[in-house]
Structure formats: structure tokens, C-alpha cells
Amino acid sequence: MAKKQATSRIIAGDYKGTKLSFKPNKNLRPTESKTKETLFNWLLNDLHKKKCLDMFAGTGALGLEALSRGAEEVIFFEKQKALCGAIEVVVKKLGVKNKCRVINANSTAFDFKKLNTKFDLIFLDPPFNESLIQKSLNIISENELLTDKGLV
């Protein structure tokens, strides 16, 4: 019997209600709706025309939520190819390919100088079983990835 698809959804904005489907994975814990709602309520006025980086995209829920609420561009990093494919399916379905880039790579090993861009908002929600917060913050700082008023 095939494994059932798990789902999450975009909770507000232009793409509210859009389902994000993915194969269940014991190492994946999508951001819960309540957590997303709280985060995006704080950011409400800070998303319009912003460039965002999702360093550990997983299902893409945070970056896609940002797009739904007015972000100009999102770059997603995800090291699992299947999850990148799932994000790309949603990006295509929403018709926002021109606003997104999905990179199948480990963000903590990527040469960010190749991107030659700064971000207004960086989502940092690494796998729960790995200690990557400090390493990621160091990468953000060393590569000067934030704009002057950027947020992590």
C-alpha cells in the first residue's frame, strides 16, 4: 500500500488555502499553522516587495506564505530533492515561478556569494534534530546576507 500524502496549507493572502502536499517523513516537521499565523502577524507590514530566503525550506510553507502575503521574491534551499520537487509543483500551480528559485542544496555548505543578493527576511527553521542555528547565523553574518533593516 502506498504511503499517504501529508499536507500543510497556506493560511492567508493571495494563495490562502493552497495545499502543500509531501510524502510523510520522520525528519520533517512542517511549521504548524498557529506558529505560522503568529509569525506572519508580526511581519504583516514587513512583507510587501521584500526579498526572502528560506534556508531550510522543507515543504516551502514559510516562503510560500511570504509570497502569498506580498513578498517580491523567495529563494528556497532544500537538500532533499523530493521536497524541492514538491515546492516546484506548488510554485508552478500558483504561477509564481518568476518570483521563486528552488535550490536543491545544503544551505550550510552553499557559497552564497554566487547569489550576489541581500535579503530583507531570512527564514531559519532547520531540522529539529540538528544543531544548525548558530552555524546558520554565522553564515548569514559572514556573507552579509541581510539588508540594513533585514530580519531573521
Report the location of each language-model feature.
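Class I S-adenosyl-L-methionine-dependent methyltransferase catalytic core
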Residues: 1-152
